[in-house]
UniProtKB/Swiss-Prot annotation:
Residues 314-347 are annotated as: Disordered. Interacts with G-actin; ADP-actin form and capping protein (CP). It comes from Danio rerio. Actin-binding protein involved in motile and morphological processes. Inhibits actin polymerization, likely by sequestering G-actin. The keyword Repeat applies. Residues 3-137, 175-311 form the ADF-H domain. SMART domains: ADF (SM00102). The lineage of its organism: Eukaryota, Metazoa, Chordata, Craniata, Vertebrata. Belongs to the actin-binding proteins ADF family. Twinfilin subfamily. GO terms for cellular component: actin filament; cytoplasm; myofibril; perinuclear region of cytoplasm. It is found in: Cytoplasm, Cytoskeleton; Cytoplasm, Perinuclear region. The keyword Cytoplasm applies. One of its GO terms (molecular function) is actin monomer binding. This is Twinfilin-2.
Length: 347
């Protein structure tokens, strides 16, 4: 799923004027897939005295936003700013994804050289004045990161701060984490203990959870029939087989997405939740996933296909600078080459 968001001319011109430091705070919102000006505040006191009274009233518990907050310090380009991504837990998933993916666009439009610090928050405590001071401390010392700072770090690492921009450059959204429901957790534990050999999971897009569909015993020949034709699914399959004389039980993860018969929302959510689900499965349930597959149809899941994916054929390495052997039987008689003397003296 690719998205392109447009920066309105009003916002672009306002950001250009604001860089000279006349304002204290700028709020940016997404409306109708456009980046628009939400609110603007002038400075009244020093940056720290203005901070909570000016910033906190703009935090909607149900809607994300970006906030550019002007500090009183300067660098070579002018006043330094704090860039805040506000994404409350109760806001809709689609909004969270849009704001997460458009972060880099807003920063680029404003001018990254003016931004001194960045923060990510889901509750007021994350980005209030005390939260910012904690953030500064954590950046200057090897102290444990807060949950919000870990989330910001993860966003940077996974490149969700993507080029969804005016240019237009595109990037997929990734990295949401829906919680596993109790039955799904129980099934994963049973798979880790080898008490079952198949799990099918689905996303509940309304409740924003990962739910168990079933754990029916499944052989390789049954596997294609487990892939729905009209909806995405996550599958974990215990692939029992022999390889080079050894009996193996390899966990294979299958993400099935049946073409474009699914809604855009489903495609976005399943794609975005996949990596975080796998991280949790490997970390919390100690399930080592031997192979991760993405398919659009169960027809692909043959025994030969699974074997080749889990054990890809290794290409023989060519010996460096090896001289080719001559044709067999055409080498002629061997010759003895002696030195300058009959007794082997040096020539």
């Amino acid at each position: 799923m690719f998205l392109v968001l447009v920066v309105t001319e009003e916002l672009r011109e306002f950001l250009a004027r604001a860089r000279n430091g006349t304002g204290r705070l700028i709020q940016v919102l997404i409306r109708d897939e456009q980046l628009v000006l939400g609110a603007y505040r002038e400075p009244r006191h020093s940056w720290d005295k203005d901070y909570d009274p000016v910033l906190l009233p703009l935090l909607d518990p149900l809607e994300p936003c970006y906030i550019l907050y002007r500090l009183d310090s300067k660098n070579a380009q002018g006043y330094e700013w704090l860039f805040i991504s506000w994404s409350p837990d109760q806001s809709p998933v689609r909004q969270k994804m849009l704001y997460a993916a458009t972060r880099a666009t807003v920063k680029k439009e404003f001018g990254g050289g003016h931004v001194k610090d960045e923060m990510f928050g889901t509750v007021e405590e994350d980005i209030c004045l005390q939260g910012y001071l904690r953030h500064i401390t954590s950046c200057s010392a090897p102290a444990p990161l807060t949950v919000a700072e870990q989330e910001l770090q993860r966003i940077k690492i996974t490149e969700v701060k993507a080029e969804i921009s005016v240019d237009p450059k595109h990037q997929t959204l990734q990295g949401l984490a829906f919680p596993l429901q109790a039955e799904a957790k129980r099934a994963l534990k049973q798979l880790a203990e080898r008490r079952i050999n198949y799990i099918q999971l689905k996303l509940d897009t309304e409740k924003e959870t990962i739910d168990l569909v079933h754990t029916s015993p499944t052989d390789i020949r049954d596997l294609p029939c487990r892939i729905p034709l009209d909806t995405p699914r996550y599958h974990f399959f215990l692939y029992k087989h022999s390889h080079e004389g050894d009996y193996l039980e390899s966990v294979v993860f299958i993400y099935s997405m049946p073409g474009y018969s699914c809604s855009i929302k489903e495609r976005m959510l399943y794609s975005s939740c996949k990596s975080r689900l796998l991280d949790e499965v490997e970390r919390d349930f100690h399930l080592e996933v031997a192979k991760k597959l993405e398919i659009d149809s169960g027809e692909e899941l043959t025994e030969e296909y699974l074997y080749d994916e889990v054990h890809p054929k290794q290409h023989a390495h060519k010996q460096a600078f090896a001289k080719p052997r001559g044709p067999a039987g055409k080498r002629g008689n061997k010759r003895l080459i002696k030195g300058g003397g009959e007794n082997g003296g040096n020539s």
